[in-house]
């Protein structure tokens, strides 16, 4: 069994990205700029945002956090996004989710111009992804693809079971895997007997946020296991995932830990996406 060490891979990619950004900056060009919008004070979002900004600063991306009270008028938030869209010195705009309950998240995600949609959630970028065109890909799905590639795990002709069909992870990841010639089975909350769909899978990717939904009896020997879930165990207070790691690892060939697997790959992919958009903006302005 080999641990898919997202923390280690992300650290190396971080060094590579820092070097790429330095080359532009040494030529006298501006640094890439990422703006993060946060509405309200969700505790988990506070942690995620502070980490994203920390990593951005470490690789040489200028980051700005715009905080808004949960009672901000919806029109005011739209206007701010539009203002950022028109700022030529901004390369990426990230809307930290979740928004307060009375905000329709999709409306604000679609308000971000596709050329600054660092999360790859705009319907134009999603449509390009669907058709297999070059575009900005959602961070967690692309991070997973990159992690598999780092360990020379091909998805071509593999039977892959994906559990969880969110717009952020499951749906885009399923499409990206299809575009890479994998055979995909997608399970949602209404799927009966998930084990029937996982037991013969070469690769299992679980993104439900439900603790230990994947157990050792549900996988075949030497399966590859990707755990996207992250939950705090109410008993031990430790972070765990969808997968019963200690037991499943004994049967799998490769497996991601929680934490230290998919999470670090998501963050570095966000930075890489910001750099991709930055390069496009810089080249366009020449």
From Swiss-Prot:
It catalyses: (6R)-5,10-methylene-5,6,7,8-tetrahydrofolate + NADP(+) = (6R)-5,10-methenyltetrahydrofolate + NADPH; (6R)-5,10-methenyltetrahydrofolate + H2O = (6R)-10-formyltetrahydrofolate + H(+). GO terms for biological process: L-histidine biosynthetic process; methionine biosynthetic process; purine nucleotide biosynthetic process; tetrahydrofolate interconversion. Keywords: Amino-acid biosynthesis, Histidine biosynthesis, Hydrolase, Methionine biosynthesis, Multifunctional enzyme, NADP, One-carbon metabolism, Oxidoreductase, Purine biosynthesis. The keyword Oxidoreductase applies. Its EC number is 1.5.1.5, 3.5.4.9. InterPro entries: Aminoacid_DH-like_N_sf, NAD(P)-bd_dom_sf, THF_DH/CycHdrlase, THF_DH/CycHdrlase_cat_dom, THF_DH/CycHdrlase_CS, THF_DH/CycHdrlase_NAD-bd_dom. Signal peptide: none annotated. One of its GO terms (molecular function) is methylenetetrahydrofolate dehydrogenase (NADP+) activity. GO terms for cellular component: cytosol. Pathway: One-carbon metabolism; tetrahydrofolate interconversion. Pfam families: THF_DHG_CYH, THF_DHG_CYH_C. NADP(+) binds at residues 164-166, 230. Homodimer. Catalyzes the oxidation of 5,10-methylenetetrahydrofolate to 5,10-methenyltetrahydrofolate and then the hydrolysis of 5,10-methenyltetrahydrofolate to 10-formyltetrahydrofolate. Belongs to the tetrahydrofolate dehydrogenase/cyclohydrolase family. This is Bifunctional protein FolD. The lineage of its organism: Bacteria, Bacillati, Mycoplasmatota, Mollicutes, Entomoplasmatales.
């Amino acid at each position: 069994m080999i641990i898919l060490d997202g923390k280690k891979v992300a650290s190396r990619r971080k060094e590579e990205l820092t070097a790429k950004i330095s080359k532009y900056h040494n030529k006298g060009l501006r640094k890439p700029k990422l703006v993060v919008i946060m509405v309200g004070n969700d505790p988990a979002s506070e942690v995620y945002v502070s980490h994203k900004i920390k990593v951005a600063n470490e690789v040489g991306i200028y980051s700005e956090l715009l905080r808004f009270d949960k009672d901000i008028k919806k029109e005011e938030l739209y206007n701010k996004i539009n203002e950022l869209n028109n700022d030529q010195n901004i390369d990426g705009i990230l809307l930290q989710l979740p928004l307060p309950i009375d905000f329709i998240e999709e409306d604000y995600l679609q308000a971000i111009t596709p050329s600054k949609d660092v999360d790859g959630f705009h319907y134009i970028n999603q449509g390009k992804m669907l058709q297999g065109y070059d575009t900005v890909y959602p961070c967690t799905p692309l991070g997973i693809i990159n992690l598999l590639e780092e360990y020379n795990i091909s998805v071509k002709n593999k039977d892959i079971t994906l559990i969880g069909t969110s717009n952020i992870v499951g749906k885009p990841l399923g499409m990206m895997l299809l575009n890479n010639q994998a055979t995909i089975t997608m399970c949602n909350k209404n799927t009966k007997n998930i084990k029937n769909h996982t037991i013969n899978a070469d690769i299992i990717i679980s993104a439900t946020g439900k603790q230990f939904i994947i157990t050792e009896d549900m996988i075949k020997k030497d399966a590859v296991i990707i755990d996207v879930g992250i939950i705090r165990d109410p008993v031990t207070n430790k972070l765990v995932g969808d997968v019963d790691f200690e037991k499943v690892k004994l049967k799998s060939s490769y497996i991601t830990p929680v934490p230290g697997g998919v999470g670090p790959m998501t963050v570095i992919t966000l930075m890489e996406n910001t750099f991709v958009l930055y390069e496009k903006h810089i080249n366009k302005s020449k």
